[in-house]
Amino acid sequence: MVRVKRGNVAAKRRKKILKLAKGFKGAHSRLFRTANGQVMKALVYSYVGRKRRKRDFKRLWICRVNAASRSHGLNYSKLRNLMKQASLNINLKMLAQLVLFDKKAFSQIIDLVNK
């Protein structure tokens, strides 16, 4: 039976991990074992971060809409309920954009909903 040397495959695998660890401090970017652990941890953090980003933006949009609607005498919950009753379907992101960039349009929405 011919002996299989894995030098090529192992070197490629290590090189790939060390390339991913570029920018890490100290041994975390130079030594394979520590770099491997840190890369795995970083990949987990990035996966979790992508899920978390969605939650964070939703919270931010709700805060913005709530603050703007309170200045008109409504809170966020009542505003969304009144919008639903008026069959006004504007998603949360667009509503937050209106609050930031077009306060006049947001005021018109409030007036339309309050009728």
Curated annotation (Swiss-Prot):
Protein's UniProt keywords contain rRNA-binding: yes
Role: Binds directly to 23S ribosomal RNA and is necessary for the in vitro assembly process of the 50S ribosomal subunit. It is not involved in the protein synthesizing functions of that subunit.
Subcellular compartments: Plastid, Chloroplast
Biological processes annotated in GO: ribosomal large subunit assembly; translation
Matching InterPro entries: Ribosomal_bL20, RIBOSOMAL_L20_CS, Ribosomal_protein_bL20_C
Similarity comment: Belongs to the bacterial ribosomal protein bL20 family.
Identification of the protein by name: Large ribosomal subunit protein bL20c
Pfam family, any one: Ribosomal_L20
A cellular component annotation (GO) from this entry: chloroplast
